[in-house]
Amino acid sequence: MIPNLLKNWTIERYWNGSVVVRGEIYNDTKNRFPDGTNIRTSSVQYIDFVAGVVRTLNSIYHLEEREVYRK
């Protein structure tokens, strides 16, 4: 079981330069959300796409790997 797993995630950048991630959370370690709840993170401090990790001020999330479709 992967903690704080975000599925079907997207990255959003706001006019002020802040970046957030939206997605469905599973295995929330702080028990804030039931599995499958759509959330928006607080401002992202760090993203590692290779490791699939997002860090905000108070949380670490794991990004579910997505397939890349190429034509």
Place the predicted regions along the sequence by residue.
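Generic structural signal for short, solvent-exposed loop/turn connectors between secondary structure elements
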Residues: 1, 16-17, 47-52
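Terminal low-complexity, poorly structured segments
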Residues: 1-2, 59
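N-terminal acidic leader/helix
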Residues: 2-32
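Generic serine detector
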Residues: 18, 42-43, 59
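Acidic, low-complexity, intrinsically disordered interaction modules
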Residues: 24-55
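Short, compact, well-ordered microdomains
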Residues: 46-71
